[in-house]
């Protein structure tokens, strides 16, 4: 009901080689069948370095849909091969160093999860080992052996999570066991620092497609003030500030990034600094409240870039956006249902939907990322 005769609906932008694309791989480690002659390692939580072999075989891989049952997998056509190799190497080293896998029901065991991040262009690997306790006595040998088995690894981080929960990363502290504690990747001609908590798209190839199309839809000429709402670590905002490789004149004069996650804003500022970008500022604040404040202060905005979470935006944000009345809105969404709801609101309040571009960010799944471009009538 909100698309007009002139709205352009582009075909889905697919991926040429839709395999091994996931640059973030997460695996739980859980006990499987009992092993013959196995005895519980010393210490109530089966900590690293204890004597004795694990009581159970160790399962790692992925959860069956809608369950907590782990499907033991040695390979996956969607996961980066080096990342998968690291997951399996950790399982092997757990057996060697007598580290018990985590039992969620009993809250026992030592190794809970591994989260592997891969730099698509650099090939660097960040391994985050989530442990049920701070003590990691064999950490130096563990890291040395892990690096031997997976030479692409450039850093290893320990994340502590002792809570009886299925939340993966804990908030009880992190320790860098090897390397700098982060990796570097390149996207649209910019470099980005990725740590264990950083948000970063899991398909770098299609992210380039997504961002290029979004920047093109913004029609930057070098004079605009743009806002990157729900900016995360600032990726698309920084691309807007600098311009795409080969088309650097098509950029915003000034970019304001806003997100309510303080650690993401810290990363965004650091990303701006090491890319030498001085025309982008980032603020840790609720996007809706920030927009409301700008509207009340009489600020003007030419282009609004927005990439909200799956739940979509909210009426406060959309109302403030309409008050600021940017000439163009480029709305990126991982949930076309909530995007349609929000776009309908914008169309009812003075905007025209001009173009729609779906991008297949997750081949072989039913998920699609969608970009909508709107212009003020």
Regions picked out by a protein language model, each given a short descriptive name:
Residues 1-101, 136:
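Extended interfacial segments that mediate partner engagement and assembly in macromolecular machines
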Residues 19-23, 123-124, 366-369:
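A short, glycine/Asx- and small/polar-enriched loop/turn
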Residues 61-64, 128-130, 268:
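Short, acidic/hydrophobic/Gly-rich beta-strand patch recurrent on exposed beta strands
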